[in-house]
């Protein structure tokens, strides 16, 4: 009688365990390296022709309104509308240092955080003339 040994299952389990323990500390270290974010609050409204934004905290501007075609992004920072290749080098310690793009989509708004946000991308449904508040950490309900 021959005994056939099956090592494929234990080897697979060992490989998964090594992979888990090898990547775990790297992922934890990455999460703990988030920079200190300064607070900002902005209310975003989708209009028939574009986007309206009202800053409640952390920026030099109070109201922004601009026309956008669907899927054409507009960069916004603490000083207002900007271009990604022409971001202001002036840094005011009394303002939040943020930069993101806002894009009007068929069903809502898409935001991409470039600087000064904990979020990389926010995407949400927004009907015409409906409002949504955001801050450095993401979407908020109270403002």
Describe each PLM feature range.
Residues 25-52, 136-143:
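Sec-dependent signal peptide cleavage junction
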Residues 20, 33-35, 44, 91-93, ...:
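Sterically constrained small-residue positions within well-ordered secondary structures
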Residues 6-8, 49-50, 108, 132-134:
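Short amphipathic alpha-helical "recognition" segments used for binding
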